[in-house]
Curated annotation (Swiss-Prot):
Gene: argC
NCBIfam families, A to Z: argC
Coiled-coil ranges (or none): none
Source species of the chain: Ectopseudomonas mendocina (strain ymp) (Pseudomonas mendocina)
InterPro entries: AGPR_AS, AGPR_type-1, NAD(P)-bd_dom_sf, NAGSA_dehydrogenase, Semialdehyde_DH_NAD-bd
Pathway: Amino-acid biosynthesis; L-arginine biosynthesis; N(2)-acetyl-L-ornithine from L-glutamate: step 3/4
Protein name listed in UniProt: N-acetyl-gamma-glutamyl-phosphate reductase
Subcellular location field: Cytoplasm
CDD domains: AGPR_1_C, AGPR_1_N
Domain of life: Bacteria
Alphabetized PROSITE patterns for the sequence: ARGC
Active site: residue positions: C150
Broad class of enzyme this protein falls into: oxidoreductase
EC number assigned by the record: 1.2.1.38
Amino acid sequence: MIKVGIVGGTGYTGVELLRLLAQHPQAEVAVITSRSEAGLRVDEMYPNLRGHYPELAFSVPDVATLGACDVVFFATPHGVAHALAGELLAAGTRVIDLSADFRLQDAEEWAKWYGQPHGAPELLSEAVYGLPEVNREAIKTARLIAVPGCYPTATQLGLIPLLEAGLADAGSLIADCKSGVSGAGRGASVGSLFCEAGESMKAYSVKGHRHLPEIRQGLRLAAGGDVGLTFVPHLTPMIRGIHATLYARVTDTSVDLQALFEQRYANEPFVDVMPAGSHPETRSVRGGNVCRIAVHRPQGGDLVVVLSVIDNLVKGASGQAVQNMNILFGLDERLGLSHAALLP
């Protein structure tokens, strides 16, 4: 049984980890931390977990206690894992970080986008970017895994087949993405209030979103060179979900793009390439650890439109983190994640 610790268990990604791990036959949550809620039982804060964690309570983060775990998940704001990851790694504990702390390979680039110096630049070289569809082999032997963000997951999975095949004009990519309000986290903010977000949709961070350098970094690796990407995120009046509409111009219109995507993801348990002409819906992935993709070439021209949908809290965060844990410990990566999405 894998002994699990969770740092930052009161946010949406934290409770989603708890929900998923409650169904996992090979993992046991031994420690969950929260400075503000120390002493409170988990099922008192989250009644959906009643009957699953009858004795588990939040505690103040303690390196010695966390270091006794086999793996520790960080479901925290950026900057927190910087301070603790090194000590946990020294204790022999593996770290899976759901925050942005170790996603970017360049400490100066991270500081530019996150507004503070990187707190553990010495760990960046060994951090493995936890996108299993790209880095599965590296994940198997990692000590420190950086779980991709939600927008980066949906966008990269949608564009990687085109870039790997050298078919897309890498200098003119567009990602037009929509997110549910849970992507903003559980902290109170005016923009997340029901009366503000309901019955409305808006673009934000058009000048530059923090996920932009992460997406570019991954697409550069797939393309084998620089990419030009316009990324525009939008907030939509739904709780969960990412819908990415991705645009790329192809250099060879004779290629069967449906076959290309089907072959690229044929052995990926959590990527569903839908039949030609499909339009994936966010509701079809709600609560599930799956990315559904459809590829279109309108009017048979050189412009390709890829539609990619995920649940931002599952494949875009906690589900992908559990998928990484499964790979890391040599388990079937579908373990605890094979449930169907919720409909309606």
